[in-house]
Regions:
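Noncatalytic carbohydrate-binding groove/subsite architecture in carbohydrate-active enzymes
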Residues: 190-311, 318
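Bacterial N-terminal signal peptides
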Residues: 9-16
Length: 480
């Protein structure tokens, strides 16, 4: 009898503990991130993360939950960590080859499971139409870079799958994206890419008239190539199919991307001012890797956190939607583990830890919500030994300003040495300002001798700056 009871209790524990274990790996203490950063100022508290259920309104953020279509990682491995991060929109890939293993037979069960579970957690789906399917001649393969369908048979099969997927998820998925990175691997011309985009988007719109679609999903941040693609779409009178232009483009220093991004914005505006920019995939490894983007450099969890937060806030400051790549490391079969995840894995089914970047992204998301309105004509000067990147926002309910800044002159370093800066602001809205480090989430008092507030003029002296985002805002914005 006793052994039977023990067996029952063991079964119950095995059923419950895995899910509890996944959730319990999130550190919710005020000291969840500790670095060597020293300000010399009084620590007041730490930013409180907000889950997707606690954040109202639209966001500027998206989160990568890719490669489930190729079983490089599994939804169950990390699903309990998505909603607590605070990003509502997740990027999924449609996975034609996983869904149609026998010609004409669609098994969406795997994707149903992910989408339904995500929706139950308050998430929104951004679904990408890819990749190919080797069961049809001339229809490509299931992996990145193999090229989209080109044969008559392959294209017809593609059309049927896109229609079936759109029909199945009508009412569940409104945001869609085109084939991922068609400009790498098998050579595709701008005309081929544009026409394939039109073909796919027209099917989506026919099934889901209010579908919101991102065009192109280009790997490169190449203004000329983008111009060539958009010209074809414009010449066909089909720009109205799309709401966003999606691009990726990895740079070792995240700040180095924006010269080309601004040029791309000008190209987009020339063709259709209505279209918005969406950075659809960017992230940084947490260790040295030999393959994939940003390989061959000694990254760390700290530099990953700095890189990701700089990318997010740089995108926000340049009016681009920003996607974080990716929620979890994944094991690219036949190559190596891609270590760009916010969560570290031992293998596809087992997490090792929550990385520093997870908490840093949480910090950014907890502050930069729909209530912050960018102040494009903000009157601010920052005097420092190094050029400082900065962007200003105003809270539309509290009336307080948020000034975020960092040293973006080089790629993130493992050092946390700071340089003092003097910040002068005219017309700012500060009442009880504090200094916040967005890597650790720690909030510090700005000493009286380092701040002067008078008649909407603010001067802050000896302000710590370094190669990660920090901000000055009122206490009421961050200590609520």
């Amino acid at each position: 009898m006793r052994s039977r009871m023990m067996a029952v209790w063991t079964s119950l524990l095995l059923a419950v503990v895995p899910s509890l274990g996944r959730s319990q790996m999130i550190d919710r203490t005020a000291t969840r991130v500790q670095t060597t950063l020293r300000t010399g100022w009084k620590w007041l508290g730490t930013l409180r993360p907000r889950s997707v259920q606690e954040i109202e309104g639209p966001q500027n953020w998206a989160l990568g939950c890719e490669t489930l279509c190729r079983d490089y990682i599994y939804w169950d491995t990390y699903k309990d960590y998505v909603a607590p991060l605070g990003i509502k929109t997740i990027r999924l890939q449609g996975g034609w080859a996983k869904t149609e293993r026998v010609q004409g037979v669609y098994d969406f069960a795997w994707l149903d499971y992910v989408i339904d579970d995500a929706l139950s957690k308050g998430l929104e789906i951004w679904l990408e139409t890819d990749y190919g399917n080797p069961i049809y001649e001339g229809a490509g393969t299931a992996d990145l870079g193999a090229g989209f369908p080109t044969s008559e048979e392959g294209l017809a099969a593609w059309d049927r799958w896109v229609q079936a997927m759109a029909t199945r998820y009508k009412g569940k998925v409104q945001k869609w994206a085109m084939w991922n990175e068609p400009d790498i691997g098998v050579r595709k011309t701008p005309e081929m890419i544009a026409r394939f985009n039109i073909r796919t988007a027209e099917i989506l719109k026919r099934v889901i008239p209010d579908a919101r679609i991102g065009a192109l999903s280009l790997a490169r941040i190449d203004p000329r190539f983008l111009d060539d693609c958009l010209r074809v779409i414009a010449d066909q009178g089909k720009l109205n199919l799309f709401e966003w232009v999606v691009y990726h483009g990895y740079t070792k220093n995240p700040d180095d991307a924006y010269k080309n991004v601004e040029a791309m914005k000008s190209v987009v505006h020339k063709h259709d001012p209505r279209l918005k920019m969406w950075q659809g995939e960017n992230g940084c490894p947490s260790e040295r890797t030999t393959k994939f983007a940003l390989s061959g450099h000694d990254w760390s969890e700290l530099t990953q956190a700095k890189w990701n937060t700089r990318r997010m806030l740089g995108d926000l400051g340049h009016d681009c939607i920003s996607s974080v790549f990716t929620i979890c490391d994944f094991d690219h079969t036949g190559r190596e583990i891609n270590r760009k995840g916010l969560l570290k894995i031992n293998d596809k089914r087992n997490l090792a830890k929550v990385k520093m970047a997870y908490y840093a992204v949480q910090n950014v998301v907890s502050v930069f919500d729909c209530h912050l309105v960018r102040q494009k004509a903000y009157r601010c000067t920052i005097e420092c030994a190094q050029p400082i990147t900065w962007f200003a926002y105003r809270h539309d309910q509290l009336g307080s300003d948020v000034l975020v800044f960092w040293n973006g002159t080089t790629f993130p370093q493992d050092s946390n040495d700071t340089l003092p800066a003097t910040i002068r602001i005219a017309g700012g809205k500060f009442h009880d300002p504090v200094w916040v480090d967005l890597i650790t989430g720690r909030i510090y008092e700005i000493p009286g001798e380092c701040r002067s507030l008078a008649l909407e003029r603010a001067v802050f002296t000896r302000v710590p700056t370094y190669d990660a985002p920090a901000m000055i805002t009122d206490r009421q914005v961050v200590l609520r």
